[in-house]
Amino acid sequence: MRKEDVIVQYHQLVSELGESAHHVVLSAGAAAVMMGLRDETDDLDADVLPGVFKWACTAKKLIVEENVNDRVTYSEKVDLHILDEDRGVVCIEGVWVYSPRELLNQKRHLSRMENRPYGKMVRDQIEITLLEELVKTPKFTARAV
């Protein structure tokens, strides 16, 4: 999915879930696409409120992963995770994503995982470098909301 596709899929997901947009926060590859760090992603990783996640656990397929938070396969292109409301978020073109600093922390964590596929680890390292530069720019210095 390119940026335009991410935006469309995000708004469709928000509508389907019936949630406020700021309660559906993209992370991982989709957030990197929205920030311009990469051109495309395979899917959306969306963090949602615990109640929405629990509902999805009963309606969809729950996948438990060691060393990574649980996820629900909501659709072929969308995985849901539990939203951490204490983490910083920003809105880019109407799409809520974790802030560059939060995404940087996530990428650092993922890159240290022993079972991380090599190709993803290489991409993580590139994005870590780009995010380290991005967090230094005034464009993303807003407080968490």
Task: Give the location of each predicted region.
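Compositionally biased terminal segments of proteins
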Residues: 1-145
